[in-house]
Swiss-Prot record:
Compartments where found: Cytoplasm
Molecular function per GO: ATP binding; pantetheine-phosphate adenylyltransferase activity
Protein name: Phosphopantetheine adenylyltransferase
Keywords: ATP-binding, Coenzyme A biosynthesis, Cytoplasm, Magnesium, Nucleotide-binding, Nucleotidyltransferase, Transferase
Site entry (Transition state stabilizer), positions: H17
Positions bound to substrate: S9, K41, L73, K87
Protein source organism: Streptomyces coelicolor (strain ATCC BAA-471 / A3(2) / M145)
Any Gene Ontology biological process: coenzyme A biosynthetic process
Superkingdom, taxonomy of origin: Bacteria
Gene (UniProt): coaD
EC number: 2.7.7.3
Length: 159
């Protein structure tokens, strides 16, 4: 079985993330979405909320599993016998950082990284940008799934 992982914080998941997950889903038999736990950062959504949102918006893909992870991504991969990491690249600036990470991960464990160019529609998109625009009342409906927009609107209203 061909397995891959799409890692990230997904706070919140965006249409850009979903595009990469969907494309990975068509290339691999099983795709894990690994939601990073970073105790140093207080996210807008708790880990459990992110996992729930991702599970709901990826439900149409029968080969996508969503789990959290803490620590090194290569350890997550080793525990689940995942030989490949799938990363979306928005711009050259992403490549510089992601290449270093790919080389480190490969050196640590032999896991390979597959880079997928982001759909040009989402080349500017990040979770941070979505949160910033939404915080100031901007329209992000075209940047996140409706379910996520609803959760984001509710969360910002209650802040």
């Amino acid at each position: 079985m061909r397995r891959a992982v799409c890692p990230g914080s997904f706070d919140p998941i965006t249409n850009g993330h979903l595009d990469i997950i969907a494309r990975a889903s068509s290339l691999y038999d099983e795709v894990y979405v690994a939601v990073m736990i970073n105790q140093a950062k207080k996210g807008l959504f708790e880990i459990e909320e992110r996992i729930d949102l991702i599970r709901r918006v990826t439900a149409e893909y029968g080969n996508v599993r969503v789990e959290s992870f803490h620590g090194l991504l290569v350890d997550f991969c080793k525990q689940r016998e995942i030989p490949a990491i799938v990363k979306g690249l928005r711009a050259v600036s992403d490549f510089d950082y992601e290449l270093q990470m790919a080389q480190m991960n490969n050196g640590l464990s032999g896991v390979e990284t597959l880079f997928i160019p982001t759909n040009p529609t989402y080349s500017f998109l990040s979770s941070s940008l979505v949160k910033e625009v939404a915080t100031w009342g901007g329209d992000v409906a075209h940047l996140v799934p409706p379910l996520v927009l609803e959760a984001l609107t509710e969360r910002l209203r209650n802040r």
